[in-house]
Design a protein with these regions (language model features):
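Short glycine-rich catalytic loops that host catalytic nucleophiles or stabilize transition states
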Residues: 188-191, 259, 291-293
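Long, low-complexity, intrinsically disordered segments
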Residues: 313-321
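FabD-like malonyl-/acyl-CoA
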Residues: 1-137, 265-298
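Alpha/beta catalytic cores of group-transfer enzymes, especially the acyltransferase/condensing modules
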Residues: 10-12, 38-40, 96-246
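Short, flexible loop segments at boundaries between secondary-structure elements
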Residues: 227, 287-310
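Non-catalytic positions within long, well-ordered alpha-helices that form the structural scaffold/packing
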Residues: 73, 178, 259-262
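A short, acidic, amphipathic alpha-helical segment used as a generic capping/interface helix at domain edges
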Residues: 246-263
Length: 321
């Protein structure tokens, strides 16, 4: 059985997420390691109030993803492929040993600070479910303007598209999407316009910072956000990490590549279950699980080929990323 680790991005966070991670020595070690780097307890940043901050959200996501991945690897559940969505790509790079956790933490903090400073209010992300990419693109092209820009950001599934841009521009797109039959068209819990040209200055800043960071070639295959390519060199991974913030994410294509590389078990690191839902719904013949506290024994049994003891669960309805 070949395994892919999926690491989620902003929008999947929820209050208490770090307190609900696996009860495992590697998780505790990682939480303590991050706390030492921050000079404060990282567990304090998962309150409802703290998660209003983009910086806190992205640090929490990095921490949760790396901590859980380390716990699984300690239990001999080793990924052949890592795929991280948006800021989840930094956690994927740590799991693949391209970046140290310390460098990833500094980069994620810089990324979040620059994103917030560039667009503190009036912008964000929205999800449209039930329309195709070309349908959404046509609506976006009709609605966007220089003063109220909107862009197609992420292709999460053939009929699950994320848009980025100004609040007013996105409202026009969402209204039109509903009128054209979208089953869901709603704002996400993301207050910056990620994955579009508006954030090119952030990408440039990250590129400069990454040029001074010690990088290593990935220990397993890293699949990129921008072009959904399998990457096996540090330079390619670094380019994807820096530039995905200013480009659309081809998530569906990325997970399809993981399947084509032989992965038939997709494990989503906390928080949430959206990415594993997408895999179950859109990748025929694969199994997918969200690795949560109560699911760890099931995941370990399945990953170690004891499929006879697995009790199937119905797929969740995916909503946002």
């Amino acid at each position: 059985m070949s395994i892919a680790f999926l690491l989620p991005g902003q929008g999947s966070q929820f209050p208490g997420m770090l307190h609900q991670l696996l009860d495992h020595p590697e998780v505790k070690r990682t939480l303590d390691e991050v706390s030492s780097m921050l000079h404060s307890d990282v567990r304090d940043i998962d309150s409802e109030e703290a998660l209003q901050s983009t910086v806190s959200v992205q640090i929490a996501l990095l921490t949760a993803g790396v901590a859980t991945a380390r716990a699984l690897i300690q239990e001999d559940v080793e990924p052949a492929v890592v795929c991280g969505l948006s800021v989840g790509a930094f956690a994927a790079a740590v799991v693949a040993d391209v970046l140290s956790l310390k460098d990833a933490l500094e980069l994620v903090e810089l990324r979040a600070e620059r994103m917030t400073k560039l667009y503190p209010t009036g912008y964000g992300l929205s999800a449209i479910v039930g329309l195709t990419g070309p349908q959404v693109l046509k609506i976006v092209q009709a609605a966007t303007s220089d003063r109220e820009p909107v862009f197609v950001a992420n292709i999460n599934a053939p009929r699950q598209i994320v848009i980025a841009g100004s609040d007013t521009g996105m409202d026009r797109v969402l209204d039109q999407a509903r009128s054209q039959g979208a089953t869901k068209a709603e704002r996400l819990h993301v207050s910056v316009p990620s994955h579009c040209p508006l954030l090119q200055p952030v990408a440039d800043c990250l590129q400069r910072r990454l040029s001074s960071v010690q990088l290593r070639n990935p220990k397993m295959t890293y699949v990129g956000n921008i072009n959904a390519r399998a990457m096996r060199t540090a330079e390619l991974v670094a380019s994807d990490l820096a530039n995905n913030i200013a480009h659309g994410v081809r998530w569906h294509d990325a997970t399809t590549v993981a399947k084509e590389l032989g992965c038939n078990l997709f494990l989503e690191m906390p928080p949430g279950h959206v990415l594993s839902d997408l895999a179950k719904e859109n990748l025929a013949g694969v199994s997918a699980f969200a690795v949560e506290q109560d699911s760890l024994p099931r995941v370990l049994r399945f990953a170690k080929q004891d499929e006879s003891r697995l009790i199937p669960e119905p797929p969740h309805v995916a909503g946002s990323t």
